[in-house]
Each structure stands twice: as C-alpha cells, then as structure tokens.
C-alpha cells in the first residue's frame, strides 16, 4: 500500500516535444528530497495532451531514470475502460510500482459503472492500483460505499482523494479501515487528512518544494504536530495560489520561474495569466525560498 509523499510530476516540454533533459533533473531533485515516489502521466503531467507513444515512452523513461530509488506510480486512466486496461498493461510491462486510475471522465457512469470499470482495470494489473477520485475534473464522485466494495479486490490498495470534502474522506477511511491507504489529492488538505487517518499526499507543490512536503508529513507521523503545522501554515498561501488557474498552469509557470523547465504548456491549456494574482504567487514562492524551504 502506498503512503508518504508522491509528486504528481509535471511533463516539461520544449518545442512541443517532451524535454527529457529537464525531466531527468526534476526526477533527481525528487530522489534527493526523499519523496516516496513520483506519478507521471497524471493531471499535473498533462496526460490528456500526450500521444499514446509519448505516454508509454514517458513512463518507460521514468522507470529507467529513477533506478528503483523511488516508486513510480503511472497514470493510466481513461474514460474508456478498454483503453485504461491497455495503458495499464503497457505500464506494468515497463515495471512500474503501481498505477493511478482516475474516474472515467465525461461519460458520467453510475456507481455500478465505476465499480465495474475499476474492477476490470485491477484484473489486468500486475501491480497495486491507486484509485483517483477528483469529481471537479471528472464530473463524477466515487462514493465511499463504492470504494468499500472495491477494497475487497486484491490489487486495489490505495486512493488519491481530491474531493476537497473532509467529511467524505473521514467516512471513506472509517469504511476501508486497513484494507486501503488514503492519500490527499489537495496540498492544502494534506495535514487535515493526516489528522483523520490519511497517510500521505500526491502533491503538486512538491514539484518545487519536495523536501518541505516530505518533512511536513514525516513530522506529523513522528508525532511532531507543531512542526508539521508550521510548514502547513507557511505554505498555506502557496497551496491556494497553486490552483488560482487550472492545474498544472500555475505550477508549470512556477517551475519555469525557478529555472526548472520552459514555461511551455500544451493547448487547450494556456500559460499563466500575468496579473496581480500571478505576481502574488511568485512572491509567495520567493518568500518560501528565502525561508530556506526546498
């Protein structure tokens, strides 16, 4: 089962191609910071704009680059169950440590449809499956009762929870018990979720500040709640501003500001708007850097 800090890693582009030089440096940064793993080809990695060839290549190159030093949980979700299975099987052949499977978007299946979709994906996976519930992007909410049913399936071992609803998260944790781990899909709710039984985060902000996110989670797990809380409060403005526009627009801009990649992003997403809010975001990040956060 997955726990700790997993970075929903960006996909850097240069001249509309994946920039592997920058990408490998990002992976090195994550390894050095001590994250538990990275999640390529997720929402933050702009997976909807990757071709099937790019998707497979990016996962393969990630596994090769990290050399087993951290886990690779590959995004293989689709609104077509058949396609999700194909992506999952391909990722498993490339020796990933797990897969991230998002709710089928656009189709708006029933809870039974969601159950059967994830059941089918899990049956074709040779590695643990992390479910991904993000109704704000998929228009469908994977209910705790459905997750409880799914927790009986051998391969389904974790869930990335991005509903923003702590009440639902608490109910989910109480239902699945020790059958599954639950990780936050919202940076600003990582600490609150840990307090009610969550075990980590799939983080966007850890692209830029992986060590800080690792420290916050570890402090809490070690019983150093005050220290964990300090990091949470220091980052609270950055957590909010990192989602001032559709993810990954703000974090992609932030990574470019600090020299980690080009600001390039693929349509239909566009570059971060230049306004008072973006200036505020950059300043908040600079303040965190001045405080010594990495």
From Swiss-Prot:
Pyruvate binds at residues 44, 202. Belongs to the DapA family. Pfam families: DHDPS. It catalyses: L-aspartate 4-semialdehyde + pyruvate = (2S,4S)-4-hydroxy-2,3,4,5-tetrahydrodipicolinate + H2O + H(+). Keywords: Amino-acid biosynthesis, Cytoplasm, Diaminopimelate biosynthesis, Lyase, Lysine biosynthesis, Schiff base. GO terms for cellular component: cytosol. Gene3D superfamilies: Aldolase class I (3.20.20.70). PANTHER family: 4-HYDROXY-2-OXOGLUTARATE ALDOLASE, MITOCHONDRIAL, DIHYDRODIPICOLINATE SYNTHASE. Its EC number is 4.3.3.7. Catalyzes the condensation of (S)-aspartate-beta-semialdehyde [(S)-ASA] and pyruvate to 4-hydroxy-tetrahydrodipicolinate (HTPA). PROSITE patterns: DHDPS_1 (PS00665), DHDPS_2 (PS00666). Its main location: cytoplasm. GO terms for biological process: diaminopimelate biosynthetic process; lysine biosynthetic process via diaminopimelate. GO terms for molecular function: 4-hydroxy-tetrahydrodipicolinate synthase activity. Homotetramer; dimer of dimers. It comes from Leptospira borgpetersenii serovar Hardjo-bovis (strain JB197). This is 4-hydroxy-tetrahydrodipicolinate synthase.
């Amino acid at each position: 089962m997955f726990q700790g800090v997993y970075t929903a890693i960006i996909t850097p582009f240069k001249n509309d191609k994946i920039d592997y030089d920058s990408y490998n440096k990002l992976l090195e940064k994550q390894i050095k910071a001590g994250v538990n793993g990275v999640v390529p080809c997720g929402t933050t990695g702009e997976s909807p704009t990757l071709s099937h060839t790019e998707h497979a290549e990016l996962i393969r190159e990630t596994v090769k680059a990290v050399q087993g030093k951290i886990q690779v949980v590959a995004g293989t979700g689709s609104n077509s169950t058949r396609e999700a299975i194909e992506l999952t099987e391909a990722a498993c052949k490339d020796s990933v440590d797990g897969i991230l499977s998002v709710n089928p978007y656009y189709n708006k299946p029933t809870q039974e449809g969601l159950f059967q979709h994830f059941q089918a994906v899990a049956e074709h996976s040779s590695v643990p499956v992390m479910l991904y519930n993000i109704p704000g992007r998929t228009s469908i909410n994977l209910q705790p009762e459905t997750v409880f049913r799914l927790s009986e399936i051998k391969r389904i071992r974790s869930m990335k929870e991005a509903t923003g609803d702590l009440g639902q998260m608490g109910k989910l944790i109480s239902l699945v018990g020790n059958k599954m781990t639950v990780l936050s899909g919202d940076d600003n709710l990582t600490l609150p979720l840990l307090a009610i039984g969550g075990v980590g985060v799939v983080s966007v902000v850890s692209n830029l500040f992986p060590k800080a996110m690792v420290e916050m989670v570890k402090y809490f797990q070690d019983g150093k709640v005050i220290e964990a809380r300090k990091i949470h409060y220091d980052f609270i403005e950055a957590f909010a501003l990192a989602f001032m526009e559709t993810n990954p627009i703000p974090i992609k801009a932030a990574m470019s500001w600090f020299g980690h990649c080009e600001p390039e992003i693929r349509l239909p997403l566009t570059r971060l708007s230049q306004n008072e809010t973006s200036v505020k975001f950059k300043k908040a990040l600079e303040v965190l850097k001045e405080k010594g956060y990495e």
